[in-house]
Every structure is written in structure tokens, then in C-alpha cells.
A protein has these predicted regions:
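Vicinal oxygen chelate
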Residues: 1-2, 5-14, 46-50, 69-153
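A short, acidic/glycine-rich surface segment
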Residues: 34, 42, 64-70, 106, ...
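Glycine-centered loop/turn positions within well-structured domains
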Residues: 54-56, 80, 126
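Acetyl-CoA-dependent GNAT
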Residues: 60-63, 133
Length: 153
């Protein structure tokens, strides 16, 4: 393959500080840039580093209400949700606890077979997921969405 991952995902927000705080407190993310990256003074661009080669480019645009619009799964347009990769099962557990403490996720962990997953919504309501390799996976075995992970029962 000629690629080794995603560089960034661009999102809209009505409250940059709230998103910075959330991603910093839950994921230990770091803000790399924060300011008017474009000539238009009504546009604020913030770059939040969420992983070794992954960033959220957050745009706060005066008067734009698109970040407040919520739609059901598969009705969200071309990008349905954002899935992040936890560094380890221990990091996954830490992130999961932090998400639950903030009310961003419930206690349900999905077992897809080779992958464990927890879904959450960020403060703007963006549907997101954290994934990690399943240490209990059986080779060649997959499970449908909605299968509760036994280790979190």
C-alpha cells in the first residue's frame, strides 16, 4: 500500500474550547495550532493532535449552525462516524472509563471478533468510536454489531 493512515479529519464546531478540553481530558490529545489559519476573521482553525499521525482540524465558523445538526446513522452524509485506534487494551480501558465518567459513552463494548469497540459522542454530538485489537479473539471468528464483549460483561 502507498498510504499508512489518515493525516487528519476536519470537523465543524460551535465551541472550540469545549472540544479541546474533551479530547485533551479523554485522549490526552494536544492542541498544536489554534488561530486564524485562513484570511477570513470569522473562521477559527484549531489542530488537535490525537495520535502519532492523526489530527482533528477543528473549524469554528461564525454563524454556521451545521455542527449542531444531528441525524441518525447512515443519514449523516458521506462520513458517518469517526473511529479512533487505541494504543493498547490498557489505553482502551482508560479511554472507556473517561468517556463513561463524562457521560459520553455507556458501558457497552462491542466484540466484532478481532476488534473491540466502544461508541461515544463528542460534545458536539459527532458519532465516534474507539477500537482496539481484541486480546480474546479467536482466529477467523467475527461477530455481528451488537455483540457484547465477554470481558466487559
Amino acid at each position: 500500500m502507498l498510504l499508512n493512515g489518515f493525516n487528519h479529519v476536519a470537523v465543524l464546531t460551535a465551541d472550540t474550547e469545549r472540544l479541546q478540553e474533551f479530547y485533551s481530558e479523554v485522549f490526552d490529545a494536544v492542541t498544536l495550532r489554534d488561530g486564524p489559519e485562513v484570511a477570513d476573521a470569522d473562521v477559527r482553525m484549531t489542530v488537535i493532535h490525537v495520535g502519532p499521525s492523526a489530527e482533528l482540524n477543528v473549524f469554528q465558523i461564525k454563524g454556521n449552525t451545521e455542527a449542531e445538526r444531528q441525524t441518525p446513522m447512515f443519514g449523516r452524509g458521506r462520513l458517518d462516524h469517526l473511529a479512533l485506534q487505541a494504543e493498547s487494551i490498557e489505553a482502551f480501558d482508560t479511554i472507556r472509563e473517561r468517556l463513561m465518567a463524562r457521560g459520553a459513552a455507556d458501558d457497552f463494548v462491542t466484540d466484532f471478533g478481532s476488534i473491540l469497540s466502544v461508541f461515544f459522542r463528542d460534545p458536539d454530538g459527532l458519532e465516534c468510536e474507539v477500537c482496539v485489537a481484541n486480546p480474546d479473539a479467536q482466529p477467523g471468528v467475527s461477530h455481528p454489531p451488537g455483540t457484547r464483549a465477554a470481558r466487559y460483561s
